[in-house]
Regions:
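A short, conserved alpha-helix in the catalytic core of glycosyltransferases
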Residues: 158-161, 169-189, 193
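Short, well-formed alpha-helical segments that are part of the catalytic scaffolds
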Residues: 15-35
Length: 245
């Protein structure tokens, strides 16, 4: 079996409710990718010390599973990247689904020498007033910053040169990596760009269970890089709370 070109890394902590649909979505996209580009993608699920059936379900669905015992999202992503065999990396959350063309678009992005990496637009799986308002603010931030962290992707060589995700922070590690990629890409004439015509669909579980003002406060904090805050697991406990799953 030939080595995969693209490795999709899915960090997962107690995600038995969502992991199967995420993997099946990625498998459909991988089928299109192989047909359209003649390349293969591997799906790596990082079991981040789950206490439920996350790892077993992932294996049943055909994903590679690696274990990371320390509950830290950056560390989990890095463990997946270390196990990856592809020259291109993409990171997908366990409660996400992808459009069937997305892996093709990511491949084309990373084949372009003028692009250092990128992300995608994020669409919620359903909408109400609260959800729509949150994503209106989020999309404004993405439009002005040009830092979209949905399905973030880059070349493995660049990822390794940067040391991967910062394991000293408990949230917004993907935002930090995006800015790091922009920094190394700029002198090389490369841009960090969002993929067009493909996106991810995400669950609304955390917005459903969290007051809007709390979500917006944390979004502003992460967006403006409050380094002291994102290094506090207590401040970021919203992302590590079993009740939100």
């Amino acid at each position: 079996m030939s080595e995969p070109t693209l490795s999709v890394i899915v960090p997962a902590w107690n995600e038995e409710k969502y992991i199967a649909r995420a993997i099946e979505s990625l498998k459909r996209a991988a089928t299109v990718y192989e047909r359209e580009r003649g390349a293969t993608a591997e799906i790596i699920v990082v079991d981040n010390n789950s206490t439920d059936r996350t790892a077993a379900i992932a294996r049943e669905c055909g994903a590679r599973v690696v274990f990371e015992p320390v509950n830290n999202i950056g560390k989990a992503r890095n463990s997946g990247a270390k196990a990856a065999r592809g020259k291109y990396l993409a990171f997908c959350d366990a409660d996400n689904q992808v459009t069937e063309n997305l892996l093709v678009l990511i491949h084309d992005h990373l084949e372009n020498p003028k692009i250092v990496g990128g992300g995608t637009w994020i669409e919620p799986e359903r909408r109400n007033l609260k959800i729509s308002f949150f994503y209106f603010i989020w999309h404004l931030y993405v439009a002005f910053s040009r830092v979209g962290v949905g399905m973030m992707h880059c070349r493995k060589a660049d990822f390794e040169s940067l040391g991967g995700f910062d394991e000293s922070i408990y949230a917004a590690e993907d935002v930090q990596l995006a800015y790091d990629l922009k920094r190394i890409g700029k002198p090389r004439g490369q841009k960090f760009e969002l993929v067009r015509d493909g996106w991810i669909i995400t669950s609304t579980r955390k917005i459903d269970q969290t007051p809007l003002w709390v979500m917006l406060k944390k979004l502003v904090g992460f967006g403006f890089g409050l380094q002291k805050k994102i290094r506090s697991k207590t401040y970021c406990e919203h992302w590590y709370d079993k009740a939100a799953r």
